[in-house]
């Protein structure tokens, strides 16, 4: 996680937090928007600075000394011609987001470096923590990248995973390369199973589809934009198991947003398609003799139906058990004798003991 202190023209100062993968995507898009200034046509015309490699990126450790720090990178961007330094893409990147108002947790700040861009513009960089140990994975098949921000793979390539996105796209590095890779093309070295996959939650979490999707496989679910579902299993490959009424199946997590959150912002963040599923990969070759442990759709459906039936029984008001306090109180009330109705007083008793008004009413009735 990187922290920036951004000073705007109205002299206001805002602190924003960005992950390296966000900075990487921003840099790639900026180069695509201004190919001449990025040196894509003629390297001598390049004025957009190189993105400095973080210190955990061993393959670029030597190059980092020449590229400078992230602070210098941002300072150079701000000094570029107005069409670049004031373009909406750059300004939007440094605007305060709702997540910036929440302080990062310890897990978020324990990254290899955090840079602070001071308002006086001087280049300072402070190391917050030491080196970070990255997880190592192996490619089970060849993968051809479809965009500049992705990374191509060959079967057997070993990569280090920098960030595991819930979308199923993982940011990885390999020697001097880095980019996004579908998690379905990767397997752990020590086991075919992904130990970080959480357990199913059949109570479900409410989500909304922010993009329509038509099922391709028989175990998938089709949804229209805006439909509400319950997520019962969040898998790291980006294909979550959802429940729509009594139907369960797989759905791309990147097309889902938690209920009650800003849908439009989530829709703008969809920059690529859903990652391929492991079952659709041809010529996949694992180094492990046994396959991954995965629940079948029948198991998901059976467990989900059982949970829903139990929840409906608990919600339905039923008869009280014989030993319950409420039932005992009702039995006690029924067993108590009813009070006797007193006899009607005689006319002589009324004339002797009642008020004059009551006496007159009695006389008129007679």
Curated annotation (Swiss-Prot):
Domain SH3: 132-191, 202-261
Example of a GO biological process term: respiratory burst
Keywords recorded for this protein, A-Z: Cytoplasm, Phosphoprotein, Repeat, SH3 domain
RNA-binding found in the keyword field: no
Region described as Disordered: 261-366
Superkingdom in the source lineage: Eukaryota
Keyword Methyltransferase recorded: no
Ranges where the PX domain occurs: 1-101
Listed Basic residues bias regions: 285-294
Main location per the UniProt record: cytoplasm
Molecular function GO terms recorded: phosphatidylinositol binding; superoxide-generating NADPH oxidase activator activity
Compartments in which it is found: Cytoplasm
CC terms in the record's Gene Ontology section: cytoplasm; NADPH oxidase complex
Residues with Phosphoserine modification: 279-280, 296, 304, 321, 324
Annotated Gene3D superfamilies: Phox-like domain, SH3 Domains
Membrane-crossing segments per the record: none
Job description of the protein: May be required for activation of the latent NADPH oxidase (necessary for superoxide production).
PANTHER family: NEUTROPHIL CYTOSOL FACTOR 1-RELATED, SH3 MULTIPLE DOMAIN
Protein name per the record: Putative neutrophil cytosol factor 1C
